[in-house]
Swiss-Prot record:
Pfam families: PrmA (PF06325)
This protein's name: Ribosomal protein L11 methyltransferase
GO biological process, any: methylation
Gene behind this protein: prmA
Keyword vocabulary terms for this entry: Cytoplasm, Methyltransferase, S-adenosyl-L-methionine, Transferase
E.C. code: 2.1.1.-
Entry function: Methylates ribosomal protein L11.
Catalyzed reactions per annotation: L-lysyl-[protein] + 3 S-adenosyl-L-methionine = N(6),N(6),N(6)-trimethyl-L-lysyl-[protein] + 3 S-adenosyl-L-homocysteine + 3 H(+)
Enzyme class: transferase
Molecular functions (GO terms): protein-lysine N-methyltransferase activity
Species of origin: Enterobacter sp. (strain 638)
């Protein structure tokens, strides 16, 4: 079906708030671009690159009355009456799949490859995770996902239980299973993420070892040898009491979705119960790991 595209230009600092505003008025998807048209393939809420000049692009159903949409947006404090925007009709495309040509097999660490399900694996003898992210987040293209995958690849997961807190596409949980974990548990607030994780687990032959839960459905008590949470700095701080009880004594914790500038505040929330390793940075993002005391 055809779509209507609404484009706003803003600062990187305001991009997330305006993306929320577009979703509230009916946008079915959001894309972020800098002024040089560099796409963000994995725009997790809060994980946008902080470009100085950012386009926020919303797609709307072709039947949407855009006059009503604009009228509502004019009341937003970051926009105001007569805000600058561009609306255009788009031809019928599969917008959710348009990026597929740019998604190639990627290696993380020594053993692990993440391969799009529509491409051939470059090394059949490697640990290959075949991935189709669908509508969920997590392809390995984002630095935070990459940091988590590299960490998992460096662990001895044989026979271990792993919890993926905020599982998205299931990429981290499935990678852990392919790397030798006996069992993985994925938790996410988004039903689409649960479905994408389930589909990807089936594609990789690990469905029987992956449990998936929405927060309201998860067991009261869960424990794991390894816990990885690639979400956001704010939730990582707020949910520290919940996340901290998940690893067993001596268990490992890996946290990402954190800007390097936010590392100290996140470390502070976990340092009482964990012996933390040096923070690892990639671009402006970082990974925090540690062992349960």
């Amino acid at each position: 079906m055809p779509w209507i595209q609404l484009k706003l230009n803003t600062t990187g600092a305001n991009a997330e708030e305006l993306s929320d505003a577009l979703m509230e008025v009916g946008s079915v998807s959001i894309t972020f671009q800098d002024t040089h048209d560099t796409p963000v393939f994995e725009p997790l809420p809060g994980e946008t690159r902080l470009w100085g000049d950012t386009d926020v692009i919303g797609l709307f159903d072709a039947e949407t009355d855009m006059k009503d949409v604009v009228a509502i947006l004019e009341n937003h404090p970051l926009l105001g009456a007569g805000f600058v925007h561009k609306i255009e009709q788009l031809e019928d495309k599969d917008w959710e799949r348009e990026w597929m040509d740019n998604f190639h097999p990627m290696q993380f660490g020594k053993r692990l490859w993440i391969c799009p399900s529509w491409r051939d694996v470059p090394d059949p003898n490697a640990v290959n995770v075949m991935l189709d992210p669908g509508l969920a987040f997590g392809t390995g293209t984002h630095p935070t996902t990459s940091l988590c995958l590299q960490w998992l690849d460096g662990l001895d997961l044989e026979g271990k239980t792993v919890i993926d807190f905020g599982c998205g596409s299931g990429i981290l949980a499935i990678a852990a299973l392919k790397l030798g974990a006996a069992k993985a548990i994925g938790i996410d607030i988004d039903p689409q993420a649960i479905q994408a994780s389930r589909d990807n687990a089936q594609r990789n032959g690990v469905s029987d070892r992956l449990e998936l839960y929405l927060p309201n459905d998860q067991p009261d008590i869960m424990k794991a040898d390894v816990v990885v949470a690639n979400i956001l700095a704010g939730p990582l701080r707020e949910l520290a009491p919940l996340i901290s009880v998940l690893p067993v004594e001596g268990g490992l914790l890996g946290l990402s979705g954190i800007l390097a500038s936010q590392a100290d505040s996140v470390c502070e929330a976990y340092t009482e119960l964990f012996t933390l390793d040096p923070v690892v940075e990639k671009e402006e993002w970082c990974r925090i790991t540690g062992r349960k005391k």
